[in-house]
Design a protein with these regions (language model features):
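Membrane-embedded transmembrane helical bundles of large multi-pass transporters/channels
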Residues: 1-37, 115, 133-399, 514-517, ...
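Loop-to-helix "switch" segment enriched in basic
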Residues: 38-42
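Structured non-transmembrane domains adjacent to transmembrane bundles in polytopic membrane proteins
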Residues: 46-67, 74-167, 396-591, 600, ...
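Short beta-strand segments
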Residues: 71-72, 255
Length: 746
């Protein structure tokens, strides 16, 4: 198949490149508006208890769970004439909007409500509303209201917060972060590619394919928005993934093409040979990454599902562009792929000699790997112990869903959230629970009384009255019951994501209700989300392990190497998760990164990072094993040959894998500049994983383990050997001559 693709691509190179240019232009135009069509939610499933309760509240009880807050502050106090005028005006205007219901404010609410809408310092009053239309419409409405009323005038400051405003700020920030990340990554990538290849022309090719992948990623995301909800967080992640993989894959193919030219092949034959060999590696790598991302579709959350759909499509686009477009460009360029040597001027400036080619057996990588294999057992023990130690903080991981603290301290929604936590202890801003008794019109006095006696509950608001510690303290707030049923609000200062918060939720559930009760609120959302993720996680892990094992078995014909790869990847990712807990949950380096440690991680992020990092780690595993296997098949297949072929394989791939890892780290690392905290975690975690995987894992641990296992590396039971002979992926031609290495380069 690869041979036919390469032959077709090199037979009609101009037509293919013109078609690619037209496709890139279409993708760019079609995907330009994608950010405005993406959603900020997707952290809970539609059939979860909290989701069903939220729908009933939205449909039957206007404003029961406000998703929008305006904070009106005056140094002269919330009761000053200026604050009252602004607060009343804002509440009235929002109340006239068709997409706003349940509007209430400190200045217009009755006494039972009014007291809790004023800050403890007396300077701030609140305007609450529920913005309808779903997450997308609500966040757009929040942005419009914030633009109209936000700011400071006549000594009164108005700021927007609440879930809808948070979503709007996140959408806006992520779009800005994407522009910044690409602005940082692309120039740095161009510089590193030029250093790696020397030739400006050769360096431009992976970058061009990467830009094509970005355009394709935007168009793919936009296309999926026509049929399903797609998370806004997929914007940065899939474009970064597309750029990183496209550059990675192109680097392998361009390097192999230049090698084949040095070996004496003609332009077209060299391009075809590059696709047959490096293209085969690219195909397996893309298949592994795509399968790992596809596993995300088993989770019933569109936050993860959108990564499955868009991620697989972007991986396919990056691989296809590398396998189809690059050969066309390479055959047209021919020897000019080595033109414009940017390093020549630097060598003349510093009086350095021209590089000479060194056989792999004389390279630094070859010597290093042989030393590692001579000390295989201690090297293995030290690295495994270090990875386990780094991963140990993951044993104390805690999970919770994102709130305004994912945003930087300077954002309006973050400022409002901080004010609510500090100055409005009685406001139910998600910390408590809202309980829906759908279709029930009976008395709830006993139920409200019992709920108010639960530890940590500060008050219970119900149609029977306001209850504190078992006693009725005030008349019932209006609107808590109607023909559809009724709801109760449980106010608490307990962190919903803490152990105490989950314990309190269980105690509230245990209180006998007069009718079937549905719980809403952050504690219930957290419990529902963790249950949903936990129920599907074993299946996801099993599918990733199985798919990786099958692909690597078809690639190598061994059952030992796939098992080793799965175990090593799991160990490597455990270390990465330990570092993320240490930094983002426990707060180490938080000042350096500018993030707020909340004491927990967003539970969907480790799953997303596990699937993606697992697939990406296999990228270098496949590339390394492909070269080791080529040498192994050409050998006598003895124990000594095992040692020699491992050293040869690492020597062949060490420099190019290091360069590929550095390039991928630049693209992913640019996301650390993001202002949304768990996007920073995503970028930093994957960057560290890629760098560690390409150096410590592939350069040290894998050779050490392959030395310890000897010829057993290539073992498979008889039936599986025959299965591989029939269905496995085999070399299409003889193994190529060794890839020389530039002297003096790592």
């Amino acid at each position: 198949m690869l041979t036919r693709i390469a032959q077709f691509s090199t037979r009609f190179p101009r037509a293919i490149l013109l078609a690619a240019l037209a496709a890139a232009a279409f993708c760019g135009l079609f995907g330009a508006s994608v950010a405005s069509h993406l959603q900020s939610g997707g952290f809970t499933s539609d059939d979860a208890e909290s989701s069903r309760a939220a729908r009933l509240l939205a449909e039957n009880f206007d404003g029961a769970q406000p998703n929008f807050v305006l904070l009106v502050r005056s140094d002269k106090g919330a009761d000053s004439a200026a604050a009252r005028q602004v607060g009343t005006k804002v509440a009235t205007k929002i109340g006239h909007r068709a997409d706003a219901v349940g509007v209430r404010s400190y200045w217009t609410s009755p006494a039972p409500i009014q007291s809790v809408l004023r800050s403890t310092d007396g300077h701030t009053g609140l305007v609450l509303a529920y913005l309808t239309g779903g997450d997308d419409a609500a966040q757009k409405a929040a942005g419009a209201i914030a633009s109209e009323f936000g700011g400071t005038a006549s000594g009164v400051t108005v700021q927007a917060g609440g879930l809808a405003a948070i979503y709007h700020d996140v959408n806006s920030q992520i779009t800005k972060d994407l522009t910044l990340a690409e602005g940082v990554a692309i120039p740095l990538t161009a510089i590193v590619l030029t250093v790696v290849f020397g030739s400006v022309i050769a360096a431009a090719l992976p970058l061009a394919v990467g830009l094509f992948a970005i355009a394709a990623a935007l168009a793919i995301l936009r296309g999926f928005t026509l049929f399903t909800d797609v998370s806004i967080y997929a914007l940065n992640m899939t474009t970064a993934l597309g750029l990183a993989l496209a550059i990675d894959y192109s680097l392998f193919i361009v390097s192999r093409f230049r090698e084949e030219l040095r070996n004496g092949l003609g332009h077209r034959d060299a391009a075809i040979r590059a696709v047959q060999t490096a293209g085969r590696t690219v195909l397996f790598s893309a298949l592994t990454v795509a399968l790992a991302l596809a596993v995300l579709s088993v989770f019933n959350l569109y936050f993860l599902k959108s990564f499955a759909y868009a991620g697989v499509a972007v991986v396919v686009a990056a691989a296809a562009a590398s396998i189809v477009l690059l050969p066309a460009a390479l055959v047209l360029l021919g020897d000019r792929v080595n033109a414009l040597d940017a390093r020549a001027g630097l060598r003349r400036l510093f009086g350095r000699p021209a590089p000479v080619f060194v056989a792999p057996e004389q390279s630094r990588w070859y010597r290093t790997v042989n030393w590692v294999m001579r000390h295989a057992l201690p090297v293995t023990l030290v690295i495994v112990a270090a990875l386990l130690a780094i991963g140990s903080p993951f044993l104390g991981v805690k999970f919770g869903y994102p709130d305004d603290r994912v945003m930087p301290a300077g954002s309006a929604s973050r400022a409002v959230g901080d004010e609510l936590r500090g100055q409005f202890p009685a406001v139910n801003a998600g910390n408590g629970a809202t309980i829906v008794l759908n279709g029930y019109s009976g008395d709830v006095t006993g139920y409200a009384t019992a709920l108010s006696k639960v530890d940590g509950v500060s008050a219970v608001l119900s149609d029977a009255g306001v209850y504190v510690s078992g006693g009725r303290m005030a008349s019932p707030p209006p609107g808590m019951a109607n023909a559809s049923g009724q709801y109760l609000t449980v106010a608490t200062s307990v962190d919903p994501y803490s152990t105490a918060g989950q314990r309190q939720l269980r105690q509230l559930h245990a209180v006998p209700a007069p009718a079937p009760a549905l719980f809403a609120g952050n504690a219930e959302i957290d419990a529902d989300g963790l249950h949903s993720l936990g129920a599907r996680l074993p299946l996801a892990v099993a599918l990733i392990a199985l798919s990786t094992f099958v692909v690597l078995f078809l690639f190598t014909g061994s059952v030992v190497l796939p098992l080793k790869a799965v175990l090593i990847n799991t160990l490597s990712l455990t270390a990465m998760f330990g570092m993320m807990v240490w930094i983002f949950q426990d707060g180490h380096l938080s000042n350096l990164l500018g993030v707020t440690a909340t004491g927990y991680l967003v539970p969907t992020m480790p799953i997303l990072m596990f699937c993606l990092a697992f697939g990406m780690s296999m990228d270098y595993e496949v590339f390394l094993l492909s070269r080791i296997r080529e040498a192994w098949l050409a050998s006598e297949r003895t124990a000594a040959d095992n040692v020699r072929t491992v050293a040869i394989g690492v020597a062949h791939t060490g420099r190019i894998v290091t360069a590929a890892a550095l390039l991928m780290a630049i693209v992913l690392g640019a996301m650390v500049s993001a202002k949304v905290s768990f996007m920073q975690m995503f970028g930093l975690g994957l960057t560290l994983t890629v760098l560690a995987d390409a150096t410590v894992i592939r350069g040290l641990l894998v050779p050490a383990l392959m030395r310890l296992m000897g010829t057993a590396n290539w073992w498979a039971p008889g039936p599986l050997r025959r299965l591989h002979e029939r269905f496995g992926f085999h070399e299409q031609s003889a193994a190529p001559t060794p890839e020389p290495e530039l002297a003096g380069l790592p």
